């Protein structure tokens, strides 16, 4: 299946948007169903970093780990899940719009299912992710445009 792709324009510079997106200690401020996230060991973000996340899925919380596979400030980052039955593979791109005071953030997201995840990805996960991504990007836009950094 094709990845889920969603974009939003934000009235902030690419540098501001990228910095906020990759500050995982703040990701729960805008990401739908994210309880917490942190870079393992508190190290600076780089290719190979592990990001520990806790997501609310239904009535329970699930822990997962993503590995950073691309990190090109202030333009793009990529990650892949390395544990659990449902593993996300994603890429975020931040592009300047107009004179560079505005940005377009595009997120591409796909999933790899293992075990029961092979059934859940096409039946539930992709639909929920599409909805959550749109809500999250609207929250991101509102947060950054109101001065939240």
Where are these regions (language model features)?
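Short beta-strand segments that buttress and anchor functional surface loops
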Residues: 49-56, 77-83
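Short, highly charged C-terminal tails/helix-capping segments
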Residues: 39, 141-149
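Beta-strand/loop substructures that line and gate deep hydrophobic ligand-binding cavities in soluble
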Residues: 80-135
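A short, structured loop/turn motif at beta-sheet edges
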Residues: 14-15, 42, 69-74, 93-104
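Hydrophobic ligand-binding cavity/cleft-lining segments
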Residues: 1-46, 139
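Short, cysteine-centered beta-strand-loop-beta hairpins and adjacent loop/turn segments enriched
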Residues: 56-62, 113-116
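Short, surface-exposed coil-to-beta transition loops
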Residues: 3-5, 61-65, 87-91
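Generic structural detector for well-ordered beta-strands
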Residues: 7-11, 38, 54, 67, ...
């Amino acid at each position: 299946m094709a990845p889920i792709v969603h974009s939003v324009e934000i009235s902030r510079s690419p540098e501001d948007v990228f910095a906020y997106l990759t500050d995982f200690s703040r990701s729960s401020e805008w990401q739908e169903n994210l309880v917490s996230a942190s870079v393992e060991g508190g190290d600076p973000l780089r290719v190979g970093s592990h990001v520990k996340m806790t997501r609310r899925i239904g009535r329970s919380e699930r822990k997962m780990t993503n590995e950073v596979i691309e990190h090109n400030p202030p333009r793009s980052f990529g990650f892949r899940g390395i544990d659990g039955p449902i593993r996300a593979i994603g890429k975020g791109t931040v592009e300047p719009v107009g004179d560079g005071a505005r940005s377009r953030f595009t997120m591409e997201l796909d999933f790899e299912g293992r075990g029961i995840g092979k059934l859940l990805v096409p039946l539930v996960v992709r639909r929920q992710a599409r909805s959550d991504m749109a809500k999250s990007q609207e929250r991101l836009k509102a947060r950054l445009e109101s001065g939240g950094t």
